[in-house]
Amino acid sequence: MTDNWRIWNKAKDYGDLLYKRAIGDLDEMESSKALCRVLSSFYEKRMKVLDVGCGAGHYLRSIRLGIDEDIDYTGVDATEYYVNLARTAFGDAARFLRGDIYNLPFEDNSFDIVICNNLILHLPPPPIKPVSELVRTSSKYIIVRTVFAERNYIIKEVRSSYEEKQGLPIRDGNLIDSKGEPLVYNYFNMYTEKYFRDIVADINEKIDVKIVPDDSWSSFDNTALAGKTATKVISGKQVSGNLLLDWRFLVLSQK
């Protein structure tokens, strides 16, 4: 498998957008607010929290505003540019590291709570290894926000905009190579509740699994900020391009 799906090193504009949310120049993401609602149900003072796929630190801003201003927080992201933005936003008030979800740079049970928002769907299938790493580094709770579906779908969203912004001549007719592989793409995978329950049981059958719908958000439209395929609300449903998004939280508790 190629690394053509790792688009974020080229997506500096997206990192800059997250940075503006982290420092308060833009509103909090609805997913950040939803995370806080789930997290607040079991968070206690002095718990250590790891944020996997932390971006530019925008989730930390929401957690500080909604839960604990002095939270013991560590953020990790595979994209160095995003990590540097997060360090700029928060200085020494939080720890941000570069690291990969497939091999997190922490010992077993290093954190009370591990959170992972909006990342699993963008990883190559199957998500077993990433989820097992989240479980490994947590001593108590894991929160994963991702898209669910009635069937399992492996989706490749073919991209060209990053190359176009760098002045490279990418024509739509040349987006897919002779072997059927997109030149640049990101995954947008959707899995069933049963699939997640089964892989968690394979990792550790003693883990308690709870599915929490993420449907308590205000109406919004991100297309002005992030383009015509950005997430928006239509008739009470979140939509991205042609995809209907059933966001839920996978909440795992270690027994």
Residue map of PLM features:
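A C-terminal cap/extension of S-adenosyl-L-methionine-dependent methyltransferases
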Residues: 198, 208-255
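A short, conserved alpha-helix within the catalytic core of class I
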Residues: 123-133
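A conserved beta-strand element that flanks and buttresses the S-adenosyl-L-methionine
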Residues: 115
